[in-house]
Curated annotation (Swiss-Prot):
It comes from Mycobacterium ulcerans (strain Agy99). This is S-adenosylmethionine synthase. ATP binds at H17, D179, G180, K181, K250, F251, D259, R265, K266, A282, K286. Belongs to the AdoMet synthase family. GO terms for molecular function: ATP binding; magnesium ion binding; methionine adenosyltransferase activity. The keyword Transferase applies. The lineage of its organism: Bacteria, Bacillati, Actinomycetota, Actinomycetes, Mycobacteriales. The gene is metK.
Length: 403
């Protein structure tokens, strides 16, 4: 343990990071297909590199026009991110776009369309007809660190990344470029955040910018100060924070020209910043029949309502599925000693209040609609800038009654 206390660090990246470009493209394709055919089965992966975008995967859909328009969808999303000129290292209008998409495997489809419960066990409930699209384990988490019930390090890192993009797009700092990363280190005492120790902000910029006289003071004033001024936290001391702006020096070569990007490579950024466990499955480009995505959203919904109900100060919940089965094969609740009631009772209440079959998750969270592109950057959880159904606190009273 450091003499400065227990230090925990989380990072975020901007929407112009190469991996996040890929997440954004994959989710934009998904949204376009769901808008035209809500029953679309989609698993789209994207790769970007210098001057090229490759979109591959499996899609089964009746949305023929949207499918035919994928190339334009890709270009529009890249341009919206801000890569609109070769001067920035990438141009959505002129980059090469290669599409290589096939149909969903019929072997997978049969397990999703006709679950084991209906196919073998003779279950008549319509929600028993849809099986999990894969085996796997998913985690959800919530903690009372912040009003949005997220761990403070990742919440603060995301706020900094969003602000980096905001000052670039609204012209406050027009010399910034789309690629960027943030990192936040916080000192804890007994799981309570007490001191902001270090903030790292690395941002792509135009070539003619003086790092010491222009970039460093601008980032401190327009990004960090703005975010910290808006941060209301009773226990956190930010008075002596160490700030590192572009600690490698200049950052002109960024985006896909600087690094290749892939869908699904920022799963810790997407979730809880390493504070909670992760089942390993990525989200972007997957329709909600894939429990990697829908069940992780459901677990966040569960965890957030448990904490909001006052049953624990922090909770992590795990669910597990077998491919082709509707009912989960496992549910696990961990409260880390912060519980107000017996964790066994919390687990029982969750089972009574939440239906965690894939079909029920999709129904209860209304997931068969184009809501995914905004989640491709700045996290899937704890968002206050977009209305996401898994962030609702609509089961608090039900949980209290079940306890």
């Amino acid at each position: 343990m450091s003499e400065k206390g227990r230090l925990f660090t989380s990072e975020s990246v901007t929407e112009g990071h190469p991996d996040k470009i890929c997440d954004a493209v994959s989710d934009s394709v998904l949204d376009a297909l769901l808008a035209a055919d809500p029953r679309s089965r989609v698993a789209v992966e994207t790769l970007v590199t210098t001057g090229q975008v490759h979109v591959v995967g499996e899609v089964t859909t009746t949305a023929k026009e949207a499918f035919a328009d994928i190339t334009n969808i890709v270009r529009e999303r890249i341009l919206d991110i801000g890569y609109d000129s070769s001067d920035k290292g990438f141009d959505g209008a002129s980059c090469g776009v290669n599409i290589g998409i096939g149909a969903q495997s019929p072997d997978i489809a049969q397990g999703v369309d006709t679950a084991h419960e209906a196919r073998v066990e003779g279950a008549a409930d319509p929600l028993d007809a849809q099986g999990a699209g894969d085996q796997g384990l998913m985690f959800g988490y919530a903690i009372n660190d912040t009003p949005e019930l997220m761990p403070l390090p990742i919440a603060l890192a995301h706020r900094l990344s969003r602000r980096l993009t905001e000052v670039r797009k609204n012209g406050v700092l027009p010399y910034l470029r789309p690629d960027g990363k943030t990192q936040v280190t916080i000192a804890y005492e007994d799981r309570v955040p007490v001191r902001l120790d270090t903030v790292v902000i690395s941002t792509q910029h135009a070539d003619d910018i003086d790092l010491v006289k222009t970039l460093d003071p601008d980032i401190r004033e327009q990004v960090l100060k703005t975010v910290l001024d808006d941060l209301a936290h009773d226990t956190l001391d930010a008075s002596a924070v160490r700030v590192l702006v572009n600690p490698t020096g200049k950052f002109v070569l960024g985006g896909p020209m600087g690094d290749a990007g892939l869908t699904g490579r920022k799963i810790i950024v997407d979730t809880y910043g390493g504070w909670a466990r992760h089942g390993g499955g990525a989200f972007s480009g997957k329709d909600p029949s894939k429990v990697d995505r829908s069940a992780a959203y459901a677990m966040r919904w569960v965890a957030k309502n448990v904490v909001a109900a006052g049953l624990a100060e922090g909770v992590e919940v795990q669910v597990a599925y077998a491919i082709g089965k509707a009912a989960p094969v496992g549910l696990f609740v961990e409260t880390f000693g912060s519980e107000a009631v017996d964790p066994v009772k919390i687990e029982k209440a969750i089972g009574e209040v939440f239906d965690l079959r894939p079909g029920a998750i999709i129904r209860d969270l209304n997931l068969l609609r184009p809501i995914y592109a905004p989640t491709a950057a700045y996290g899937h959880f704890g968002r206050t800038d977009v209305d996401l159904p898994w962030e609702r606190l609509d089961k608090v009273d039900d949980l209290k009654r079940a306890i």
